[in-house]
């Protein structure tokens, strides 16, 4: 959901064009593209080539997604690292140094950032939030299994008490 949210903000608030979203789950990818005017591919797609993008958001944070971000960012480009799934792994310092790639880690936000985000969501500046699915807390285990197994199409699930 963080990747979709980043894409929606870039598209609808920042008026960015040529957005590409990468998602391994075909169902989630198809569902996300209903809400975002973007190209969508699986991570192993031949459409994702090296040195292709000026800015890359890694919203997952696995070693494999970090490596893909480094491979596909253009020389002089920027990688914004948000995801925290895996704490460590291999890192191509040579490419990032020789090609002067900027890496920005982001985790926390200011109260002003939080207020702005709530305003964007409340005023539907990024469209309806129909991509969010709500389930009871007792369905949490099955929701995680569906996400893991690739059978869940919802980009975001919120568990309700």
Residue ranges of model-derived segments:
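Short conserved AdoMet
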Residues: 14, 61, 74-75, 152
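Short, well-ordered coil/turn residues at beta-beta hairpins
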Residues: 57-59, 161
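C-terminal hydrophobic helical "lid"/dimerization subdomain
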Residues: 67, 111, 115-161
């Amino acid at each position: 959901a963080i990747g979709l949210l980043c894409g929606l903000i870039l598209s609808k608030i920042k008026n960015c064009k040529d957005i590409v979203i990468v998602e391994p789950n075909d169902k989630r990818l198809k569902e996300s593209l209903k809400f975002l005017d973007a190209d969508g591919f699986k991570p192993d797609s031949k459409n994702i080539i090296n040195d292709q993008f000026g800015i890359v958001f890694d919203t997952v944070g696995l070693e494999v997604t970090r490596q893909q971000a480094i491979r596909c960012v253009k020389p002089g480009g920027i990688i914004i690292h948000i995801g925290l799934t895996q704490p460590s792994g291999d890192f191509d310092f040579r490419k990032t140094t020789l090609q002067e790639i900027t890496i920005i880690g982001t985790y926390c936000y200011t109260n002003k950032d939080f207020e702005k985000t709530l305003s964007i969501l409340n005023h539907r500046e990024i469209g309806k939030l129909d991509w969010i699915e709500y389930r009871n807390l007792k369905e949490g285990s099955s929701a995680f299994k569906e996400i893991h197994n690739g059978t869940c199409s919802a980009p975001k699930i919120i568990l309700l008490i």
